[in-house]
Amino acid sequence: GVIALMTRFGMEVSLAYPKGYELIPEIMETAGTFAEESGGSFNVCNSMDEAFQNADIVYPKSWAPYKVMEQRTELLRKQDTQGLKELEKRCLEQNAEHKDWECTEQNMKLTKDSEALYMHCLPADISSISCDQGEVSAGVFEKYRTDTYVEAGYKPFIIAAMILANRFENPVETLEYLMRRNDKRIHI
């Protein structure tokens, strides 16, 4: 995930989430190891305000707790439709307890010079726009909309690069071969 990538490159990463929303333990361990090896840092807290303090970049993103994803996977394997409905209901109830975990203008004022870059992989739950109570206020999203859309525009290329890197033993050689071949992909 993104926290492992950022810690790998020596960034100071503060991960904040409400209690009960833990991530995959291996990801957390990897992020900690990368931070140690790169000279960065990895801090975990349960306060959005604490994580935003003096931050250069914020990347607030909602997720389901790892334990919920484990339960969901098991229910899917069993094809337990009723169990999935009950789990979804419990998740919505749990999420309702944390509606204050929204990236707002007030949070952004806590960042370095009150001007941190807001990032999001999209789509975002935008309060009063795409939902009643979301993960980011309309004001914050609007201020950073262009930057966020540019960021999202890179996703297809990053995904393609990851596929190439994992499917071919020597991706550079493969790309060079394709370029030399100069085969047109669309034939009319």
Language-model region placement:
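Glycine-rich loops and low-complexity Gly/Arg-rich segments
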Residues: 14, 38-42, 69, 82-85, ...
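Hydrophobic alpha-helical scaffolding
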Residues: 45, 94-101, 148-152
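Glycine-rich phosphate/diphosphate-binding loop of Rossmann-like nucleotide-binding domains
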Residues: 1-74, 78
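Conserved active-site and cofactor/substrate-binding residues in soluble primary-metabolism enzymes
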Residues: 1, 23-26, 46, 53, ...
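Broad structural signal for hydrophobic residues in well-ordered alpha-helices, predominantly aliphatic
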Residues: 31-34, 107-108, 162
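Hydrophobic/aromatic ligand-binding patch that stacks against planar heteroaromatic rings
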Residues: 5, 107, 139-140
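ADP-ribose/adenylate-binding Rossmann-like module
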Residues: 71-132
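Adenosine-phosphate binding glycine-rich loop
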Residues: 111-188
